[in-house]
């Protein structure tokens, strides 16, 4: 199993959690506050528990205690950042729920709304709405006073959307999660495209039982993406802007007023021809993670990464095979990298240095075609 190095762990933990007021003010916190206020008004007799845990969590709370199968693909190191055999950087804020449920089981409380916000760590694609360090919010109402089911879930969904995105058209579609029954995905309409903002469901009885809550307890579970909600609320079309240090942008990340675009930096495109093994995982998530790791502190300069084409060894011209020194079973990928920092313009020389870093991270062949 691949485990993070000490340097990689320190780098991950050093990244600012935009949901944490102790690390500075950010509009993401206003989204959380507005949801908390709306649900508190809807459920005046429900206790509110706000939880903020360290991002290094037990593997069991990230997966097992939420009902994930032992062979679930999401457990693999290509998707999860392992700190040790038994600890991970949480891949979702749902990892805070099992300890909260255990605390509830040991308490005298009978109706609680658990609010868990924080940064998460994933391996994800590079595009305008994805990042490897998203911010998520888990909202779980657990009660033995009232029976919570699908009607209450529908009401909770409506209150969430009406609070953060008033007037927005939305829909729900069936979704499967190991920690819910009657699972749903929540989408909102942006222009002519449905954009996912979160998932939810009725809390799965087996998850409650694992925490020591008997069958008198029922619950609702919801996990909206905070970055996505804020971007839709403010009209932001680039997730990297949420962390921008450009004063013209950063000043607008303190409220929920519509975003006013600043002058756009020109994109720099570089097409890469790389060789990969037949067994290589070339999914957008895995390639995106390799790009971010390769660029390090310059990772936010990558606006997008797209595989334009794939050619097998057998389908390549002999001249191309010889030039790349490919062997049977390997593949040639044509990858387009778009570089565009949100706060400055790259020179050609700077772009070429970044291009070569990405090339080295993706290319598995013996011949290096570097620019610098």
Model feature map: region roles:
Residues 134-144, 267-272:
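Short, flexible active-site loops
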Residues 149-184:
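Extended C-terminal subregions enriched in glycine
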Residues 144-145, 149, 162, 229-231, ...:
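Long, well-ordered mid-to-C-terminal structural blocks that present hydrophobic/aromatic surfaces
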Residues 39-46, 108, 161-169, 294-305, ...:
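Short secondary-structure junctions
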Residues 119, 172, 307-310:
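Hydrophobic/anchoring residues in structured secondary elements
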Residues 178-372:
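A carboxyl-terminal module marker
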Residues 1-130, 136, 141-142, 194-208, ...:
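Class II aminoacyl-tRNA synthetase-like tRNA-binding/catalytic domains
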């Amino acid at each position: 199993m691949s485990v993070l190095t000490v340097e990689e762990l320190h780098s991950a933990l050093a990244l600012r959690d935009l949901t944490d007021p102790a690390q500075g003010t950010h509009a993401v916190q206003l989204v959380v506050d507005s949801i908390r206020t709306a649900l508190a008004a809807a459920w005046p007799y429900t206790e509110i528990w706000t939880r903020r845990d360290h991002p290094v969590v037990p593997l069991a709370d990230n997966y097992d205690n939420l009902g994930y199968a032992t062979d679930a693909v999401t457990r693999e190191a290509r998707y999860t950042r392992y700190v040790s055999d038994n600890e991970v950087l949480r891949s979702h804020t749902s990892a805070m729920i099992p300890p909260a449920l255990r605390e509830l089981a040991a308490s005298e409380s009978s109706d609680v709304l658990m609010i868990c916000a924080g940064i998460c760590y994933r391996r994800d694609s590079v595009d305008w709405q994805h990042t490897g360090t998203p911010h998520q919010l888990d909202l779980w109402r657990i009660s033995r006073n009232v029976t919570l089911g699908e009607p209450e879930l529908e009401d909770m969904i409506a209150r969430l959307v009406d609070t953060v995105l008033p007037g927005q058209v939305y829909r729900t579609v069936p979704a499967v999660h190991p920690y819910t029954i009657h699972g749903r995905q929540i989408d909102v309409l942006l222009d002519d495209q449905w954009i996912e903002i979160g998932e939810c469901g009725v809390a799965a009885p087996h998850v409650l039982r694992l925490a020591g809550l008997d069958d008198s307890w029922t619950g609702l579970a919801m996990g909206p993406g905070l970055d996505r909600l804020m971007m839709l609320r403010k009209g932001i079309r680039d997730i990297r802007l949420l962390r921008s240090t450009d004063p013209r942008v950063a000043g607008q990340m303190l409220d929920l007023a519509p975003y006013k675009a600043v002058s756009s930096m020109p994109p720099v495109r570089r097409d890469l021809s790389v060789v990969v093994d037949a067994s290589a995982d070339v999914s957008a998530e895995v390639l995106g993670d390799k790009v971010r790791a390769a660029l390090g502190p310059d990772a936010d300069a990558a606006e997008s990464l797209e595989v334009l084409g794939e050619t097998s060894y057998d389908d390549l011209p002999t001249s191309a095979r010889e030039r790349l020194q490919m062997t049977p079973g390997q593949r040639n990928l044509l990858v387009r990298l778009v570089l565009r920092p949100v706060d400055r313009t790259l020179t050609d020389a700077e772009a070429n240095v970044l291009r070569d870093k990405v090339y080295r991270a993706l290319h598995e062949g013996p011949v290096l075609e570097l620019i610098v």
